[in-house]
Amino acid sequence: MVLIRVLANLLILQLSYAQKSSELVVGGDECNINEHRSLVAIFNSTEFFCSGTLINQEWVVTAAHCDSTNFKMKLGVHSKKVPNEDEQTRNPKEKFFCPNKKKDDVLDKDIMLIKLDSPVSNSEHIAPLSLPSSPPSVGSVCHIMGWGSITPIEKTLPDVPYCANIKLLDDAVCQPPYPELPATSRTLCAGIPEGGKDTCGGDSGGPLICNGQFQGIVFYGAHPCGQALKPGVYTKVFDYNDWIQSIIAGNTAATCPP
């Protein structure tokens, strides 16, 4: 079974396939409190259901399938139960999606750019991660993180984000397990061929950081998480650099690559 890696309560995403419950990092360890300063928690009245990445003081990048009617974003958070003194909460002021995204197709151009209702300040636990200067190379070591499930089948949500290292794999590795993905999808394939480490339900929208650069957005994967030869699929940020920069510069009519 394959599912979008987001919480099951986002019912609008349930189309012809089963939706993947929110994903957590499976096979990882608790993140160091200072190693996820750009990680954004996206939450509603009941739970953290997605993550995002702060790319400057006013803008966050996440997955389009993380969109919801009412949500807030928390920055500088580590533990859900023990707040950091520098945590900041923001609402979305504007949300941008690829104008050429196929309607009602959650597998197409899964990226959302959010302008915050007010800028955030850099602090001990908050700092942006810039857009990538070049695309990643196969074999790169990549870092995943999130508050998603830490068990592959039953949902087990941690109080703190979990982190793990995986590798960028050749796109061909992701084609057999996910034939439903468009052939032209601008995505990355990343994981551990033998399985054991993966993003999971609740990790959707979070970053894939390869060699220190923000290269991917948690998008799609298998359920149970962490299966052998079924790595995760990530939206390829580098392919959307021009669109993101155009929107930030004020060109709201900018179009994403096909």
From Swiss-Prot:
Protein keywords: Disulfide bond, Glycoprotein, Hemostasis impairing toxin, Hydrolase, Protease, Secreted, Serine protease, Signal, Toxin, Zymogen
InterPro entries, per database record: Peptidase_S1_PA, Peptidase_S1_PA_chymotrypsin, Peptidase_S1A, Trypsin_dom, TRYPSIN_HIS, TRYPSIN_SER
Primary location recorded for the protein, binned into one broad class: secreted
Protein EC: 3.4.21.-
An example molecular function term from Gene Ontology annotations: serine-type endopeptidase activity
Entry-linked Gene3D superfamilies: Trypsin-like serine proteases
Signal peptide: 1-18
Glycosylation: residue positions: N44
The keyword Secreted is assigned to this record: yes
Annotated compartments: Secreted
Summary of the tissues where the protein is detected: Expressed by the venom gland.
Any one GO CC term of the record: secretory granule
Top-level division of the source organism's lineage: Eukaryota
Propeptide boundaries: 19-24
GO biological process: proteolysis
Domain Peptidase S1: 25-249
Disulfide bonds: C31-C163, C50-C66, C98-C256, C142-C210, C174-C189, C200-C225
Record's function text: Snake venom serine protease that may act in the hemostasis system of the prey.
Subunit structure: Monomer.
Family membership noted in the UniProt record: Belongs to the peptidase S1 family. Snake venom subfamily.
Name by which UniProt lists this protein: Snake venom serine protease catroxase-2
